[in-house]
Swiss-Prot record:
It comes from Bombyx mori (Silk moth). It comes from the Eukaryota. GO terms for cellular component: extracellular region. Its main location: secreted. Keywords: Secreted. This is Juvenile hormone-binding protein. Prevents juvenile hormone from being hydrolyzed by general esterases by combining with it specifically. It is found in: Secreted.
Amino acid sequence: DGDALLKPCKLGDMQKLSSA
């Protein structure tokens, strides 16, 4: 499941952007 791997990555990126 590519989406399963992409979802956490996208969430992580969003959190990084929010933190920054």
